[in-house]
Amino acid sequence: MLYAEPRVPNLNAKELAAYLADLCSWATVELREEFTAFWLGRLSEAEQDRAVARLAMAWAEARLGPAGPRETPPLPMEVRYEEKRLLDPTSSAMGLLYDGLAVMAALRELIAAGERTRQHLHLVLTNQLLATPDPGGRYHCRVALFGYPCLLSASGAVEGPAKPRAYYLAKQQARLSGIVAAELAAYGAVDAQAYLDYGDARLTAVLKGYAAQAVAYHLTGEPFCADRGCRLFNAHWQEEMLF
């Protein structure tokens, strides 16, 4: 089951579904609307209200700060913000970073029991920035989170893999001129084709690789391949992701 993300116009969910259907010729690939809208639409009005309240609280609790996970309960206004975002498929929390594993657990509860099985792969496209901690506890932005459901972040494809080294060198050298000047200098120092940016037409092709990794993970428990030319390669740099 592939769930569309209407907030990302340059992400072609139909093309991605066709790719998965060709890759997994033994399986049925179903393209569905946005994940939350799909599952909320199958609940009664009272059930929807309760589900939205639970989800909004979960998203608010999963929001990460500069130091990592929050240490205090979410403010009512933060929960209301998440409620509004959940009920409007066109809204987006751009710039906010969430604990990906906490989000995954919250979304899992929406899936009907009959589809919460090993026979079903749920692949959720999202525009939210998701992160997981490294062994030292430092959170890193991710493109893909493999679990149940699997999550693919369009924003994560832009922000997760590191940009070319020239980008960071130019940014460091120009930082004394101010943050904006540093960003402009960094982007100007690198060929635009060397990294993925917002609105990039290459996003769908990039996410095909991560979708293939999700399938591999679901079938074998191992999503990656050591071959740099393989779609299953675990890219840490933008240039590896776009290879």
Where are the predicted features?
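Zn2+-dependent metallopeptidase catalytic core
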Residues: 9-30
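Metzincin-family zinc-dependent endopeptidase catalytic domain
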Residues: 37-224, 234
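Short hydrophobic beta-strand segments
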Residues: 1-10, 37, 123
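Acidic carboxylate-rich catalytic motifs and surrounding loops in phosphoryl-/glycosyl-chemistry enzymes
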Residues: 30-38, 226-230
